[in-house]
Amino acid sequence: YLRDEESGQFWSPSPLPARGTGAYVTRHGFGYSVFEHHEDGISSELCVYVAMDSAVKFSVLKVRNISGRSRRLSATGYVEWVLGDLRPKTAMHVITEMEGKSGALLARNSYNTEVPDRIAFFDVDDPSRSVSGDRTEFLGRNGALHHPAAMGRTRLSGKVGAALDPCAAIQVPFDLLRDRGHGRLLDGPFALTVA
């Protein structure tokens, strides 16, 4: 999700889950997809690809300000953990935590007999991030991905642990300057990585 921090308007850089008002251009290739979109003076390009030599999925977001004024935005990445064959069967066993040194969100399912020692992660390289491991909190009561309750809050709560409806959400606020073709490649600061 991308959100204008001044107006509260939000949209996703891909057609789902929260389609913006403008058109989307989607390109697919061997092992990757690229989504381009322009919304209210903000140009975004989301490149999703998988590593050739490991079980890692990357989402690299490039954001550019073409609005003619400075903008304060936030980018929010969201995934729902499965860690097994079917989410309804595994969700009650998934435990989330935040790794102390890196701040990455981790998830594990020790009850998965096929891979009990595997750990999934979701991370971004930006210290101003906020996180949540609680899907119910992120979506809200009777919430939906096209309009999650978290998009109405300033920050994510930081709630992680056991006995939650598990997810991983990371939100990063950032500023884009005006009239300089200024952009931000959220690749180091916001390469969402899921394994």
What are these model-predicted stretches?
Residues 1-195:
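Anionic coordination/interaction segments
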